Design a protein with these regions (language model features):
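Repeat-solenoid scaffold signature
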Residues: 19-55, 121, 129-132
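Extracellular and organelle-lumenal recognition/adhesion modules and their flexible linkers in secreted
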Residues: 58, 62, 83-214
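Structural signature of tandem alpha-helical TPR/SEL1-like repeats
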Residues: 4-17, 39-48, 70-78
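Alpha-solenoid helical repeat scaffolds
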Residues: 1, 13, 26-32, 46-47, ...
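A structural motif in tetratricopeptide-repeat
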Residues: 5, 15, 22, 56-57, ...
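Structural motif corresponding to the intra-repeat A-B loop/turn of tetratricopeptide repeats
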Residues: 2-5, 39, 99, 135
Length: 214
């Protein structure tokens, strides 16, 4: 409030005092870091921002975005200024895919311990996967999906047709990009039939019942 009213010096003193009284309060560190950055005190600013990320990983994503803007995508400088913690790496991976820097995205992602990919940073992995799908980097997306998959999840593999015999149910909605999908429209009619089969327990039936051939 003081800074907005023109008292930047008073605002700085108040924030420094707050950080002194509550050194582990991440919101104070984050606010102080942004204040220092606006004052052109870059070195001090990112020390505070880094401390905010250390105590609250929710600040990792905005810290990455901010550092990216300040250092124009220089990853060495970004890591130097906000650190290379696992939380930062997990945020950098999907962010870098948006910048089409796939190799660097995977370098950061693959440095995260395998178990943490499935647990602590699974949500980041899902974001990473979705960004790769959007970028049409399907092989890489499949790699990430296998890394974050739960034991009960479907298992997809490169060069392998999933559910080729339709012994598993076809999802009517929310199917993976690597799974079978039912398209819109009324033709053909698609169903699974246990009475007509060549192997297994059932076959896929396609019924064309259109008077105009469409």
């Amino acid at each position: 409030a003081r800074e907005r009213s023109g008292d930047a010096v008073g605002a700085g003193k108040a924030l420094l005092k707050a950080a002194e009284l509550a050194p582990n309060y991440s919101e104070v560190r984050w606010t102080l870091g942004n204040y220092l950055l606006r004052q052109g005190r870059e070195e001090e600013a990112f020390k505070e921002i880094s401390k905010a990320v250390e105590t609250d990983t929710r600040y990792a994503n905005p810290a990455v975005v901010l550092a990216w803007q300040v250092y124009d995508g220089d990853l060495n400088m970004i890591a130097q200024k906000i650190g290379d913690s696992t939380a930062i790496k997990a945020q950098l991976s999907p962010f870098l895919v948006k910048q089409k820097r796939f190799d660097e995205a995977f370098n950061f992602w693959n440095s995260i311990p395998d178990e943490e990919k499935k647990t602590t940073y699974r949500k980041n992995g899902e974001d990473f996967y979705n960004q790769l799908i959007e970028a049409k980097s399907f092989r890489n997306a499949l790699t990430v999906q296998s890394q974050i998959a739960k034991p009960e999840d479907e298992k997809f593999a490169v060069g392998t047709l999933f559910n080729p015999d339709f012994e598993q149910n076809v999802k009517p909605a929310n199917a993976s990009v690597f799974d079978w999908k039912l398209g819109g429209g009324i033709q053909p009619q698609i169903s699974l039939d246990a009475s007509q089969k060549h192997a297994g327990t059932r076959s896929l039936i396609l019924l064309y019942n259109s008077s105009d051939g469409k």
